[in-house]
Amino acid sequence: MIVSRIAKTLDHIDTGDVVIFHANAKQDYIKRLIGKPGDSVEYKKDQLYLNGKKVDEPYLSENKKHKVGEYLTENFKSRDLKGTNGNMKIPSGKYLVLGDNRQNSIDSRMDEVGLLDKNQVVGKVVLRYWPFNRWGGSFNPGTFPN
């Protein structure tokens, strides 16, 4: 995996990009950026809504074929997450990340990760070379609204 540290400022990281971040003092995680400061995020019946608009997530299509239960991503709203104080909008300086393997992902939905602080982000993943059958740099198919 190749990571761009140039994008570390988050000025060059967009919703839908895959990022690497410090989850704790010993581990870095790789997850997809779903929400930025000021965004409201909701999952309802396996559908992502970002600021009230439906967002397609084609990168989840393979995982949805193998899900256990009714939904790959359980229903939640950004206001339910630790660090939002019940507000629907993600607070200033915070970021919401989710793993593509939603049913087995330790991500912003879990208190142990929660919403990320800007300084936790190491950079944006720009090239994946493992597994070989998914080699490439297309992590954000352009489905997120600007």
Where would I find each of the regions flagged by the language model?
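Soluble "head" domains of membrane/secretory-pathway proteins
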Residues: I2-N146
